Amino acid sequence: MSKLFIPYIMGNKDFISNLKVLSDEGADIVEIGLPFSDPVADGPTIMEAGNKAIEEGMNARKILQELKAHKDELKDTKYVLMTYYNIILHYGEEQFIKDCEAAGVYGLIIPDLPFELGEQLKERFKDSSVKIISLIAMTASDDRIQKIAQHADGFIYTVTMNATTGENGQFHPELQSKIEYIQKNADVPVVAGFGIRNPEQVSTLSEFTDGIVIGSEIVKRFANDSETSIRQYLQSIRRALDETKAAANS
């Protein structure tokens, strides 16, 4: 299996065209952020993008409607929604899951929903095609890692730094051993995210992960750079992932 490239974009007025660019350039799964007024897990870049999307009139309902309208064009791309639980609650759980299914959503990442509540949500909608994606922090105990990993759907998102997303900082010193422990206990790919910016970091991390998530850097580039420049950057990330995979197989 190739290493997974999972970029994140904000659900703004341009998100469908951005999604198509990412799909063109080898994204395996795209995370789409639902804009929220109090995004506690987001760094300043994503927070600013979310505020701007809200000003543009974007919300969960509009994003799901657009995904549904473009579903046939996007059929080769898996996309997941990153959303705070309050958005789902406000929307209505059952209707939200139903609309996600209609829009072709592969899964949900809900950073403020603890594992136990996530399992209850899964149980309530066990016949749904929408996966609840698990997050594991580097501070999690071995027992907790085992429990989360053994119940995981889709993929596991490991948080590489104990901070908000996209801020400068060092990767957790025990990252490799933790990820290998998660992989040993999981039947799904284990990807790393938070704070990843460049091909060098991607090459390092993908030696021992099943893929990487890039958020703030991609949001920043879609806000500021030309499409040509964005595509070149995305190609450099895809290349770094493919070269790591090729080296591992040689």
UniProtKB/Swiss-Prot annotation:
InterPro entries: Aldolase_TIM, RibuloseP-bd_barrel, Trp_synthase_alpha_AS, Trp_synthase_suA
Biochemical pathway: Amino-acid biosynthesis; L-tryptophan biosynthesis; L-tryptophan from chorismate: step 5/5
Key words of the record: Amino-acid biosynthesis, Aromatic amino acid biosynthesis, Lyase, Tryptophan biosynthesis
PROSITE patterns recorded: TRP_SYNTHASE_ALPHA (PS00167)
Active-site residues, as the UniProt record annotates them: 31, 42
Family to which this protein belongs: Belongs to the TrpA family.
Subunit field text: Tetramer of two alpha and two beta chains.
Reported function: The alpha subunit is responsible for the aldol cleavage of indoleglycerol phosphate to indole and glyceraldehyde 3-phosphate.
Protein name, UniProt field: Tryptophan synthase alpha chain
Species in which this protein is naturally found: Staphylococcus carnosus (strain TM300)
Native organism taxonomy: Bacteria, Bacillati, Bacillota, Bacilli, Bacillales
Gene name of the record: trpA
